[in-house]
Amino acid sequence: MDLAVGPGAAGPSNVPAFLTKLWTLVSDPDTDALICWSPSGNSFHVFDQGQFAKEVLPKYFKHNNMASFVRQLNMYGFRKVVHIEQGGLVKPERDDTEFQHPCFLRGQEQLLENIKRKVTSVSTLKSEDIKIRQDSVTRLLTDVQLMKGKQECMDSKLLAMKHENEALWREVASLRQKHAQQQKVVNKLIQFLISLVQSNRILGVKRKIPLMLSDSNSAHSVPKYGRQYSLEHVHGPGPYSAPSPAYSSSSLYSSDAVTSSGPIISDITELAPTSPLASPGRSIDERPLSSSTLVRVKQEPPSPPHSPRVLEASPGRPSSMDTPLSPTAFIDSILRESEPTPAASNTAPMDTTGAQAPALPTPSTPEKCLSVACLDKNELSDHLDAMDSNLDNLQTMLTSHGFSVDTSALLDLFSPSVTMPDMSLPDLDSSLASIQELLSPQEPPRPIEAENSNPDSGKQLVHYTAQPLFLLDPDAVDTGSSELPVLFELGESSYFSEGDDYTDDPTISLLTGTEPHKAKDPTVS
């Protein structure tokens, strides 16, 4: 017990308690069997560590763990001394462990103050470690700042690209809208060009002709291009007189005009069975009246941009106007060319004053006279509806389907080098043969005296829907087609004799292709 108290009383006060206890433990002679000084006094030996931990350590320390005792020695700078025999392969016979410290010497207790714990060295290592870590953290922060700057740059670029993408989408939408508008404009231009091409190929009328749906008591104004011309050969000598104001509307539709022979083309405004039309360029004194045969004309499909025309056929013998011809019977008679039609025969003549003339030889089959062709309202309305539906279908095709137009093809339409088969024009020979066949077998030829004996012959009106005249050169027309109007070939055929002079008649010059040179009539607007 004194040994335990002794160490607390001995030694200086600034020596650590572990060192004081260790000095007392080593210097105690009662424990020399387990712990004691070395013979030199520079170190101490610990024998039988197990027994030492069980019997000695609990007396001086709060534990009996040999490892903790060795760790405490290392903290104060004690080192384990290793001998040569302990480093061999043979285990030593005695368990002996020696520890030494330069300041822990036998008989020199005052040197215990120099023994310190290794706190300073540990703090130095920690500071160096902290400095190294600080450098690493600084480098990491620098790298993070660089990455942050690059990330901000990428964000700005992405934002700019997003704005540019939105601007591009808006521009694409605007361009699509403009493209749609331009496509509509192009479609309208194509329709306009097609209408121009059709108007250049077809002789147009300046204004629409009113429909003959009902009789009208008041006569309408005469069209600008309404004029009369004959389709048959004029017998007898005598040229046409010079054109006069007879082409005006007042003289053309006057009841006092002189009656002449030959088919007349004009506009029918009302039914006038007792008022025949006048021939524009002749008088009774200049030319005798001649008879003509009834003209059967096939009804061709009308051209959509123009109104139908009406042909007035004037046979040499006047006929009675008792039974008008219905359009259905007239069309059936046209289809049956070989069969006699009720409208092909002529009856007793009747002049404008109602006096009966001597009867002339007539065909064996009695036929009714050809009166004014009365248009059926239902048939005409059906025809107009069909035309409207065709125009609507064409407009739908042009507007709904996108297509491209070759400008060279449009320019070729105006070029004089274009061939007629490309334009699908009708056949001249077949059409001319058909009209001559219709003109010739109607009645046998009569002498000129019989024609002159009937000065006052009436006219019969024939409903005729003609194709509009094409403004083309007859010399350049290809006769291989099958649908061209027969009026082209009249100027080249032998229908007119070479001795007759028709240069003064504008209608004949229109058929022959020669334009008469005359001053413009001031009455024609």
Swiss-Prot record:
Residues 380-405 are annotated as: Hydrophobic repeat HR-C. Residues 343-355 have a biased composition (Polar residues). There is a cross-link at K298 (Glycyl lysine isopeptide (Lys-Gly) (interchain with G-Cter in SUMO)). The keyword Kinase does not apply. Keywords: Acetylation, Activator, Centromere, Chromosome, Cytoplasm, Cytoskeleton, DNA damage, DNA repair, DNA-binding, Isopeptide bond, Kinetochore, mRNA processing, mRNA transport, Nucleus, Phosphoprotein, Stress response, Transcription, Transcription regulation, Transport, Ubl conjugation. Residues 15-120 are annotated as: DNA-binding domain. The modification Phosphothreonine is found at T142, T323. Residues 221-310 are annotated as: Regulatory domain. It is found in: Nucleus; Cytoplasm; Nucleus, Nucleoplasm; Cytoplasm, Perinuclear region. Phosphorylated. Phosphorylated in unstressed cells; this phosphorylation is constitutive and implicated in the repression of HSF1 transcriptional activity. Phosphorylated on Ser-121 by MAPKAPK2; this phosphorylation promotes interaction with HSP90 proteins and inhibits HSF1 homotrimerization, DNA-binding and transactivation activities. Phosphorylation on Ser-303 by GSK3B/GSK3-beat and on Ser-307 by MAPK3 within the regulatory domain is involved in the repression of HSF1 transcriptional activity and occurs in a RAF1-dependent manner. Monomer; cytoplasmic latent and transcriptionally inactive monomeric form in unstressed cells. Homotrimer; in response to stress, such as heat shock, homotrimerizes and translocates into the nucleus, binds to heat shock element (HSE) sequences in promoter of heat shock protein (HSP) genes and acquires transcriptional ability. Interacts (via monomeric form) with FKBP4; this interaction occurs in unstressed cells. This is Heat shock factor protein 1.
